[in-house]
């Protein structure tokens, strides 16, 4: 990423020698040039906390400054010690690395189904489309029937007639099925892009991907298959063909926290608060932001994120997700959040592959990271 700045330039000597290879004289020489120092945005305290919380599980943690987009932590597990490559690596070490679950893969930059964390995007599309207001209510039920197929509520039963705030707090699938069918996949894809899905830079890091929210036209082009109403239903709750990277998840929730600005993630401190990384307006209205925030706060105050409301840290806001994985594997666990609520400073995203429920595996990791940040912040001024 920064080799050009760090490595400098080799020096050289041009020497005349005789037939025996003995030096006769120096014809010319070029002095070496030292490399430049590079300061990263990473907070070593938060980075360690994220890695320790992940505890070598397959997954990722990303923490951003909600105002500037500076990457404060980016952990991917399982990890490895890169210092072993400063010398000749032994065969045993290489075999041990190969036995692990692909430690060379930066999972912070890989696409995953975002599950219910994506309901932030669907809420935005619903209200900003004009087809719903922030005060709209819909009836929920144990399931809805679409194209002869039943799409179920995650809790088994409905939640009655509710609005967006409670739909986020309860994570009602049948509420968001209806929103998705009303606004359509194109609107969802449009607002997902504005919030950072598929439009967030990987900061020059190799081996990553970008998220995507396929539309009917793209599905036809990529797979040669028509779009079904069931595809829209799945998209609305972050399943099906939707893919989002943990970095993009953090960008989305940062935009909710900072007033609707899509931050530009970056790793070099020299890029902070420069035109290159200036946050971009998403066009979200204040009422939309307030509605989503109230739902995310409710998740922490009494919903699936209530482990974060134990009094050990200031009040935060967030959303859990539990993503289905093909092949009968255990679900992926997700969490996105920001804090503190009264003065948002950091946003984070957590995924644990095959971790089960978001509240079970991802929320405890988020709690440890938030706690590390807030404990440090009590003895240090807030982020700029």
Language model feature labels by segment:
Residues 2, 256, 365-373:
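Short amphipathic C-terminal alpha-helix that caps PH/PH-like domains
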Residues 10, 55-59, 112:
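Short, small/polar residue-rich loop motifs at catalytic or cofactor-binding pockets
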Residues 61-66:
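Short hydrophobic alpha-helical segments used for membrane anchoring or interfacial signaling
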């Amino acid at each position: 990423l920064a080799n050009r700045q760090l490595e400098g330039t080799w020096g050289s000597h041009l020497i005349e020698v005789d037939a025996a290879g003995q030096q006769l004289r120096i014809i010319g020489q070029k002095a070496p040039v030292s490399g430049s120092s590079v300061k990263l945005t990473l907070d070593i305290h938060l980075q360690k906390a994220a890695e320790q919380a992940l505890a070598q599980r397959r997954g990722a943690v990303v923490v951003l400054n909600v105002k500037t987009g500076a990457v404060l932590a980016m952990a991917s597990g399982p990890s490895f010690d890169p210092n072993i490559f400063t010398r000749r690596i032994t065969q045993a070490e290489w075999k041990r690395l190969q036995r692990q679950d692909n430690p060379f893969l930066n999972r912070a930059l890989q696409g995953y189904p975002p599950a219910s964390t994506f309901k932030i995007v669907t809420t935005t599309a619903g209200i900003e489309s004009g087809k719903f207001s922030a005060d709209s209510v819909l009836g929920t039920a144990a399931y809805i029937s679409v194209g002869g197929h039943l799409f179920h509520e995650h809790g088994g039963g409905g939640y009655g007639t509710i609005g967006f705030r409670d739909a986020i707090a309860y994570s009602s699938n049948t509420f968001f099925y209806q929103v998705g069918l009303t606004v359509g996949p194109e609107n969802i894809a449009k607002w997902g892009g504005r919030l950072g899905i598929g439009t967030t830079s990987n900061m020059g890091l190799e081996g990553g991907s970008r998220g995507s929210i396929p539309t009917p036209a793209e599905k036809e082009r990529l797979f040669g298959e028509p779009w079904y109403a069931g595809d829209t239903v799945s998209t609305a709750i972050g399943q099906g063909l939707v893919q989002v990277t943990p970095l993009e998840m953090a960008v989305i929730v940062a935009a909710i926290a900072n007033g609707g600005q899509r931050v530009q993630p970056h790793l070099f401190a020299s890029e902070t608060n420069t035109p290159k990384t200036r946050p971009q307006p998403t066009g979200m209205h204040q009422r939309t932001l307030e509605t989503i925030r109230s739902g995310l706060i409710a998740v922490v105050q009494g919903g699936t994120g209530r482990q974060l409301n134990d009094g050990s840290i200031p009040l935060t806001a967030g959303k859990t997700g539990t993503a289905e994985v093909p092949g009968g594997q255990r679900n992926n666990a997700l969490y996105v959040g920001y804090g503190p609520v009264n003065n948002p400073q950091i946003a984070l995203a957590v995924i644990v592959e095959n971790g089960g429920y978001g509240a079970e595996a991802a929320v405890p990791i988020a709690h440890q990271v938030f706690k590390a940040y807030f404990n440090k912040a009590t003895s240090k001024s807030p982020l700029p």
